[in-house]
Amino acid sequence: MTTTAIVYSDEWRHFDYGREHPLRMERLGLTWRLMEAYGLTALPRAKVWAPERAELEEIARFHSREYIEILRAVSAGDWVPNAAGYGLGPGDNPIFPGLWEAAQLGAGGSLLAARLVADGEATRAFHFAGGLHHAMPGRASGFCYVNDAVLAIMRLRQRGLRVAYVDIDAHHGDGVQFAFYDDPNVLTVSTHERGDRLFPGTGFVVEMGEGAGLGYSVNVPLQPLTDDAVYHEAFEAVVPPLVTAFKPDVLVIQLGIDSHRTDPLTHLSLTVQGFTRAVKRLLPLAPRVVALGGGGYDLTNVARAWTAAWAAMNDVDLPRDLPRESHRDMQRLGLGILSLDDPVETSPPDTRRWAEEYARRQVGEIQDRIFPLHGL
């Protein structure tokens, strides 16, 4: 029997990247309220857990102590003249009060999800405030200060577990790839908008790992305007075969929904139902699953997608019409059709062909270069 855990804290409402920043903490409370309205926070086989802030020593397993001290200093309001050298300052990674505590909370939630799965207290755990996959050992990057995904995988590896990481965010999961680039015990797979069109500028097929880890970093770059049909053709051709061949003990999935067709920062063209299809395809690929959030800058997409993902983790079929209790939130944020699913739209033939041809070339390269290294 599947037992599940969801990790959530309303403490997130105390943190704020700034009024003009696209990453809005409001999305977390909005998601939680939609889950509540659907009855998903009181399921009989699911337990709600509150995260504790990660200790400095846990964060230092991946991040340098020098960088951690800089984070603590700027968070406390100290003047750090070289903060920009650590990726901190106006723009993507602003300095705000409580920055360090927010980073600790995010890391703590993902570490808790990993522990619950490793200890057998849950077969599937979801920390939707996590998935901040860009942070590097010594610098912030892409709205991410501490890489909770890396820390969660490290905790699972401490237990001797073999881990596959699949990242379906629109942005390449560069920080996670970097952390395990030479490690054959961690398979990282990222599907994302091509790096020459979108931050962070990486994630090409030729980034395959190195040394003992050669073939264990897999990237599926996609053309802007890639829709559900093109995405799933590429996804099916690459992800299930490689994950199945790898035989992970635990699957860690990063569920960024900035791949959505109305996301303001990216250029892919998935729907909520296309996203959910990918989640449902991933869940059976390993006996245990740790799910994390990620990108997503249209708040109604975030709430609907992560609610649908949590329902899938619990094998619950949801009504397509959004619960009445959620209508005020959704209408306030501009959602026109009060449905869990998006209206069906057909890509123009030239756009579909352009995306399809590019995706098929990437898949062909992966099958030629990486599949043989896994006996495929």
Where on the chain are the PLM-derived regions?
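N-terminal low-complexity, Ser/Thr- and acidic-residue-enriched intrinsically disordered segments
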Residues: M1-R61
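Low-complexity, intrinsically disordered regions enriched in charged/polar residues
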Residues: M25, R53, R61, R65, ...
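A general "terminal functional-core" signal
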Residues: M1-Y8, R13-D16, I70-L376
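Short amphipathic alpha-helical segments with coiled-coil-like heptad repeat character
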Residues: G39-T41, Y67, D119
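Cationic, histidine-enriched alpha-helical/coil surfaces that engage anionic ligands
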Residues: K47-G87
